[in-house]
Amino acid sequence: MLTYRITALGRVQGVGFRPLICRLAGAHHITGTVRNEGGVVTIIAQGSREALLSFMGDIRAARPPVEVAEMRVEEIAHAPLPDFRAVSSGGAARAPLFPADLGICEDCQADMKDPKDHHYGYPYTSCTACGPRYTMIEALPYDRERTAMKDFPLCKDCEKEYQSLSDRRCHAESIACAHCGPRLKGWTRERRFEKEVAMAEAIRLAKEGAILLVKAMGGYQLVCRGDRKETAGCLRRMKHRSGKPFALMMKDIDMAKAWAMLSEKEIEMLTSPVRPILLASPRRKVLPAVASRVPRLGLCLPSTGFYSLLAEGIDAPLIVTSANQSGEPMIFRDEEARAYYEAEEDIAGLFFYDREILRPADDSVMQLQGREVQILRRTRGFLPEPVVRDAPSGMVLATGADMAPGFALAGGGSLYPAEVPCDILNERSQAFFLETEQDWEELLGLSPQAVISDLHPAYLSRLLGEKTARERGLPFYTVQHHHAHALSVIAEHHLQGKSLAFVFDGTGYGEDGTVWGGEILLCEGTSMQRVGHLAPISMIGGDASMKQAWKSALSYLAAAGLPSKDPRAPLIRAALSHHVNTIKSSSMGRLFDAAAALLGLGEENHFKGECPMALEAAAMAAAHAPKIFWEGKEQDGRLLWDGRTLLASLLASHGTIEEKALAFHEAIVEMILSSAEHFGLPRILLSGGCFSNQLLLMRAREALQKRGFSVYTNEKVPPGDGGIALGQAWFYLMKNQK
């Protein structure tokens, strides 16, 4: 008889892991205990060697939402144990692992439709495989009395399910039904509703084309039909959202397949417990008021029982978007939602439940890049889980960058990145950013010993970092923007030694004080050498030109000495020649903007990346492309690629707009491949917001791999600024490791 101490790390809390272990122990005739210690599960298991090995094999093979990322095993001496049981939860001895919110599972949806089940018609049913966790937890260990469900005592039926090891709701802390759980309430301008009547009213209003304000799992959302032009247009005006696409919620996977071309992998992503917004190739056209001039359609499946019932009742795609003005913090508190409802006369009804949301979580956004999943927004389904669990020791706060606000906390060998659902342009949003970060410190039990931010001296994220460091008396560090992007890939994959990183994005403060963004970096450890980049040109407007693609185009034409019939061209040339409001830029994002504008695909970015997305959409419609000639040239020890040559060649080429758009993409791939061969390093990193371009990333990866290069990209955090805090934190930990 042997005794093993098994330590399991990963997604093992709030997902029915302890009941699963008890069932597996019984099946393998194992005695012992299982205990949750602050998100790390410790199992004492006694049995024969064969039984123990088989037992551990079944643990490793556990199906989602359980994810055992790491299992440590040691043989110990222990007195004989008579049976196997789950013992009381303990406190956290190391950096904790909190459970994430998970979308409603198929079993709970089936229960809601079964008149014989006591969960029938209940819009907030959940089990160990689904439901809220992160948004309702107060502290570890994860037990009901330390969640927002503590005010909802279990009824007899739910108590029976909670205690039964054979039930999938065993120890599901969010367990509830219509008899004991949070109640659905509905408000209209004239009446108040509850429970089934409120659900029926929500369906009736939405079916008629009304806009609803709905309390979802992680905050309030605006919901309406996606097939009504007037309704979608009204929602745009309400949100002050001129062009950014809306996502559509489909009632089930069959409806999703009718609207988008989905591979088996994309179906798996869409139906996963994360319940993300998936960007996929559209099968049919959507209303221009929903989405236009973008290569992919955002779609999702219901994440809660309420949404499942609503979508089923309406039987049409639903627009679902966060309830706030663009850039403002997501509304998640009831009093704010009621004030918002009262102020917006176009909202026909408010539908909510009487349980508090303790912290917000927006929908995650994902897409498939070839065979690889790419995360574009890492929120519900992931937060607050770490992406690195064996980092160097040290505690640090990284404050990210301004374009996609977020932060990362490090401690106990784990790295926890978080995106904050707002911008940080005003005091209210900045206060929300700091409030969220401090909440995470308390939640995770971490006390940063340093703060690290972006190198840009005027970034608000840096100013917030400096303020935090100053108020707490902590040392303050900075790291260059594109270096941090590269380090985010290195951190994810635990890479050591030299790597050649291509970091392409819209903007980032360079070490020479100019705007970088088309970077080729040699990285090793914490060192970075800029070995190549786009040739810098003088650009009008600095970072402000990010929204005005026409300025990028005219700046490039002026730099190339090419004529333009645009009536604004003389003014731009005059400003450039007199150095009025100009800055040197090597930004790849601005080169994409310039190409889109010169091909007539867009002059303004009404939302981030609009013109480059239009360029990508056009390129994906082409079957072949004219050859565009450009090449890198060595200058002052660096390999420079001149965007003026590329654009001049593009304008002189023959073909349709779509073919020229494809030619532009192929030229950027040629830049990557040729540069990789020039420097000869076998390991290539691709990061930065430009690599959310599906066509660019897929073709670049394919071309590099065909030539024998190993290619690494961001897989656990976004390639854009939403993932940059991870790289910042990694820089500090590596720089200060003992």
Protein language model regions, located:
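Glycine-rich phosphate-binding/hydrolytic loop that grips phosphoryl groups
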Residues: 482-504, 508-510, 549-558, 665, ...
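Conserved phosphate-binding/catalytic loops in two-lobed NTP-binding clefts
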Residues: 454, 473-485, 684-687, 694, ...
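A phosphate-binding glycine/aspartate-rich beta-alpha loop in the early core of alpha/beta enzymes
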Residues: 75, 211, 219-282
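Internal gly/pro-rich beta-alpha loop/helix module
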Residues: 314-390, 580, 584-585
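Short glycine-rich phosphate-binding loop at a beta-alpha junction
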Residues: 213, 445-457, 681-691
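A contiguous, well-structured pocket-lining segment that forms one wall/lid of small-molecule binding clefts
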Residues: 159, 170-174, 181-183, 401-439, ...
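Conserved phosphate-binding catalytic cores of ATP/NTP-utilizing and phosphoryl-transfer enzymes
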Residues: 257-263, 309, 330-337, 363-364, ...
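Intrinsically disordered, low-complexity, mixed-charge
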Residues: 1-174, 178-185
